[in-house]
From Swiss-Prot:
InterPro entries: BH2638-like_sf, UPF0223. This is UPF0223 protein BCA_4066. Gene3D superfamilies: BH2638-like. It comes from the Bacteria. It comes from Bacillus cereus (strain 03BB102). Coiled coil: none annotated. Pfam families: UPF0223. HAMAP family: UPF0223 (MF_01041). Belongs to the UPF0223 family.
Length: 89
């Protein structure tokens, strides 16, 4: 994709790598599908970096503006389906 991910320059390099992987997983859920456990593990790591609901909503809004993909909707879908299933939006 030809856009910039929302990143906070206060995050460590490791946290930035984790966030990019998480954004890529959300894209994958929309474009091809992703195994639920893979997405949920990245979401858990995302929540360690961004524990605040307000910050999570801000990042989701910024990501949706540049990509057209909703983090919230993808995670809600993942929570609704059974383990070992594909999350596809």
């Amino acid at each position: 994709m030809e856009y910039q991910y929302p990143l906070d320059y206060d995050w460590s390099n490791e946290e930035m790598v984790t966030m990019v992987k998480f954004y890529e997983a959300i894209e994958k859920a929309y474009e091809k599908g992703i195994i639920r456990e893979e997405l949920m593990e990245l979401y858990r790591r995302f929540k360690e970096i961004v524990p605040s609901k307000a910050e999570e909503k801000k990042i989701d809004k910024e990501f949706q503006e540049v990509s057209g993909y909703s983090i919230y909707r993808a995670i809600q879908r993942a929570k609704e389906i059974e383990e070992q299933k594909l999350v596809k939006m």
